[in-house]
Amino acid sequence: MGIKHVEKPFASTEFIKNINYILKRMFKYYEDRLDPEGFLSLLKMWRDYLIMKEDEEDIYPSNLKIAHDEATKEFYNRNEDFSLDVYCNFKNAIKCYEYLEYENNGYKIRIPRDPCEMKKVGKKLNICVGAYVSSVAEKTTKILWLCNRNDIPIGALEVKDNQLVQAKMANNHHPNYEVEQIIKSWCKKKELIIASF
């Protein structure tokens, strides 16, 4: 489907259908967490699913979590190379936010090295961050790695408009308490607003 087709399901004429879809999924997956955070997390999952889809069919999957996970696997199994333009734009974009890098208590927050690393880390962590290469290259979002003592990425952080909008560990898990404290410390030091984890 790709990012160009994401606008279609979010068109104003589809608003009621979209809200009904998300509310049904929210009650299915987040019965224990019916709050704005759960709603936002589900919307992000749906958006990511739509970005990774190659076709326009099944924009309202009956099981969003399974459909998202399958789309993620399919995305990483595609043998796509990045164009020279995307590669160069990506490299230029990440240089613009090197100032967000940070170290604390053995953890490191750093920029991705290149688009290939984005795809490789996303596949390893089983998260869809590899689908964000174009968004980083177009400077519409910033992705950083949360790394362990050996500089191995253990999570991905998304920053938009000076706000942390996502922090995902392997398999889309939320950070544990220790990691959450590192992220909060980083946000405070870099003057980022925590909009969501």
Q: Would you name each region that the model predicts?
A:
Residues 1-197:
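Glycine-focused motif/segment detector
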